[in-house]
Every structure is written in C-alpha cells, then in structure tokens.
C-alpha cells in the first residue's frame, strides 16, 4: 500500500504571518490538529494545537492578540513521498515521534498529509501497533 492511497489529499497551508487566533479557529472549524505553514511556494513549518499551547499560551510573554504562526511553528519539517510504501512512512513517523507527516510529490510539492488516524484505518494491525507505541513513547 502506498502513502497516496491513505493520505488526506488537497491540504492547504497558511502564511507564517497568519495570526495564531486564526489558526485556532481554522483548527476548530476543520476539526484538525495541525496546519502547514508555507512561504514563497515552499513548506517552511507546521503549527499543531500543542505548539499553540506549549510555545504560546504557556509562555508568560505570549500575546495571543499579536502572535503569528511564525512565533509558534515547528521548523525543519520532515516529509514523505506519495509513492512511498505506507510501511516506510509509518517507520518514519515512529522514528520522529510525530503523529502527522506532510506528503510531497516528485516535484516536491505538498499534495496531502498522512496521520496516525489514517494509519489506524488502513494499516495492518502489527504496523499500527508499532506506530502507536513509537509515536506515543516519551521523548
């Protein structure tokens, strides 16, 4: 099974200048836990609901009214390719201890997102079990 067979297709990204409050509203409206951040046609980061809490709200100097995606995003994003075997992507998620991976095509354009939930719906039980254990392990 390939990543393209299980991923969420057509994921959009937002600018690093997008207000954090808007990010939270987008997450709520679309029932999602992360939003890719792009600039000049390149994926430059990701913001998760956890980033907003841990890098933002938990910080005494954080100003939610002024904060942008750039203030809370995680950079150095790892991806997988749409033609990768799902097993390869799952092992990548385990190693990185991440619940989501952006998916790129041969032209290095983001075409989707694969999540732990996607793995749960489509992967064999043994692969799913290993992924959940790896991703859930304490950092």
Predicted regions and their residues:
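Tandem CBS (Bateman) regulatory domains
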Residues: 1-10, 48-79, 85-94, 113-139
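The conserved cystathionine-beta-synthase
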Residues: 13-31, 79-97, 104-105, 123
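A glycine-centered beta-loop-beta connector
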Residues: 27-30, 35-50, 93, 101-117
């Amino acid at each position: 099974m390939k990543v393209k067979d299980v991923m969420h297709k057509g994921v959009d990204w937002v600018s690093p200048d997008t207000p954090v409050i808007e990010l939270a509203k987008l997450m709520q409206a679309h029932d999602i836990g992360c939003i890719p951040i792009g600039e000049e046609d390149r994926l430059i980061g990701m913001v998760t609901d956890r980033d907003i809490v841990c890098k933002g709200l938990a910080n005494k100097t954080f100003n939610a009214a002024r904060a942008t995606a750039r203030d809370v995003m995680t950079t150095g994003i790892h991806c997988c390719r749409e033609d990768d075997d799902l097993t390869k992507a799952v092992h990548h998620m385990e190693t990185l201890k991440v619940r989501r991976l952006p998916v790129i095509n041969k032209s290095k354009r983001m075409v989707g997102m694969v999540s732990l939930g996607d793995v749960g719906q489509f992967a064999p039980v043994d692969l799913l079990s290993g992924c959940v254990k790896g991703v859930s392990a304490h950092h």
